[in-house]
């Protein structure tokens, strides 16, 4: 152990040392360096990014904001919150802005959790939920999944006297599962008022119109509800990092107390505000995803690969020896997401891309499977 390691081991709290760092999807530039590939020849379907990129409105606004980069941004995000307020039908005091929605989740942990408290989340929950929980020394309660998603009955039963937060994603990441809104509403009616329920809707824009719900209106009935949303997915602003939370004004006030100053940069604020004006781009993103999802599902079925029904912009596919198959895909310049860290070692998560990107992945996967047809028999198990 080096001197630095020894000092860190002696001074960092045990709950911090026990945290496994978040592993993002492999960047295109990293794979290019590792294998000597041209970046233009690499397809990345690993991080659920919008293959269309950002709205032209957002891009122009972000570029204009760069002219004032010597100045701090509006720390309160007045203009963006005003536009969100009008769009959502809530008061601006009910909105908190984050450096991506992950920042909002982190604020929740710092405002509501501490050693001696607990948070409840599903077995296959977004990795940031346990990370945020454990970072502040709280206890995480992982509840067994039902059909790869949330079992709300078990999650309600898991709430203890020391529970302060329940994390729910709808649709869920990394599995793509979806809970009917009436089930979530019924769950909220049973949760003790002292417990904050965080409803993560990062992928909400990919839901079919008939499956959408005005959950922002729920905060009047459920003051212990916080809704988390992002501009990183359907809006195509992942690189700028901007998200927001909607909740009771008292909850938002607490989050603002732990929010870092100037946590959303000027270009992100400007781009997000402009993106809200481009409904045509959002509709195009939805349509592209719907078509791409069908392309992926059809191609995977043709390869006899089972998938978990998904309402997001990605699909979870059981391929068997996922680690080996992922390595072979990388050699072919295709980046997808292994999910062994989520307890799903037989699966790969594949983001929906452009038609050509989806075809490139399916062709590469078919090539890999043909080269080693004896894949793990579990890859053929029926999924819900």
Swiss-Prot record:
Protein name according to UniProt: Histidinol-phosphate aminotransferase 1
InterPro entries: Aminotrans_II_pyridoxalP_BS, Aminotransferase_I/II_large, HisP_aminotrans, HistidinolP_aminotransfase, PyrdxlP-dep_Trfase, PyrdxlP-dep_Trfase_major, PyrdxlP-dep_Trfase_small
Cofactor(s) essential for the protein: pyridoxal 5'-phosphate
GO molecular function: histidinol-phosphate transaminase activity; pyridoxal phosphate binding
Subunit structure: Homodimer.
Keywords tagged on the record: Amino-acid biosynthesis, Aminotransferase, Histidine biosynthesis, Pyridoxal phosphate, Transferase
Family (UniProt): Belongs to the class-II pyridoxal-phosphate-dependent aminotransferase family. Histidinol-phosphate aminotransferase subfamily.
Sequence positions bearing N6-(pyridoxal phosphate)lysine: 233
Native organism taxonomy: Bacteria, Pseudomonadati, Pseudomonadota, Betaproteobacteria, Nitrosomonadales
Reaction catalysed by this enzyme: L-histidinol phosphate + 2-oxoglutarate = 3-(imidazol-4-yl)-2-oxopropyl phosphate + L-glutamate
GO biological process: L-histidine biosynthetic process
């Amino acid at each position: 152990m080096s001197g630095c390691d020894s000092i860190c081991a002696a001074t960092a709290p045990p709950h911090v040392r026990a945290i496994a760092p978040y592993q993002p999807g492999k960047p295109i530039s990293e794979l290019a360096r590792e294998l000597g590939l041209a970046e233009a020849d690499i397809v990345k379907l690993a991080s659920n990014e919008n293959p269309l990129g950002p709205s032209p409105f957002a891009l122009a606004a972000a570029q204009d904001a760069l002219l004032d980069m010597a100045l701090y941004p509006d720390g309160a995000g007045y203009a963006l919150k005003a536009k969100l307020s009008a769009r959502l039908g809530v008061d601006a005091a009910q909105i908190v802005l984050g450096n991506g929605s992950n920042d909002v989740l982190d604020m929740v942990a710092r405002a509501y959790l501490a050693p001696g408290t607990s948070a409840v989340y599903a077995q296959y929950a977004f990795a940031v939920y346990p990370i945020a929980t454990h970072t502040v020394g709280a206890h995480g309660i992982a509840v067994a999944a039902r059909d790869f998603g949330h079992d709300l009955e078990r999650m309600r039963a898991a709430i203890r006297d020391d529970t302060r937060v329940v994390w729910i994603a709808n649709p869920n990441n990394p599995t793509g599962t979806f809970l009917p809104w009436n089930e979530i509403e019924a769950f909220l009616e049973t949760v003790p008022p002292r417990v904050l329920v965080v409803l993560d809707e990062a992928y909400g824009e990919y839901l079919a119109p008939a499956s959408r719900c005005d959950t922002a209106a729920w905060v009047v009935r459920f003051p212990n509800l916080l809704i988390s949303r992002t501009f990183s997915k359907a809006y195509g602003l992942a690189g700028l990092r901007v998200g927001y939370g909607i909740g009771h004004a008292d909850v938002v006030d607490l989050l603002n107390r732990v929010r870092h100053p100037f946590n959303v940069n000027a270009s992100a604020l400007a781009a997000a505000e402009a993106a809200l004006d481009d409904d045509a781009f959002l509709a195009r993103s939805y349509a592209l995803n719907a078509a791409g999802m069908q392309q992926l599902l059809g191609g995977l079925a043709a390869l006899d690969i089972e998938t978990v029904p998904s309402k997001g912009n990605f699909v979870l596919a059981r391929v068997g020896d996922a680690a080996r198959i992922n390595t072979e895909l990388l050699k072919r310049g295709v980046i997808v997401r292994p999910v062994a860290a989520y307890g799903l070692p037989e699966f790969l998560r594949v983001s929906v891309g452009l038609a050509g990107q989806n075809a490139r992945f399916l062709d590469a996967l078919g090539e890999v499977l043909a080269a080693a047809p004896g894949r793990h028999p579990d890859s053929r198990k029926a999924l819900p």
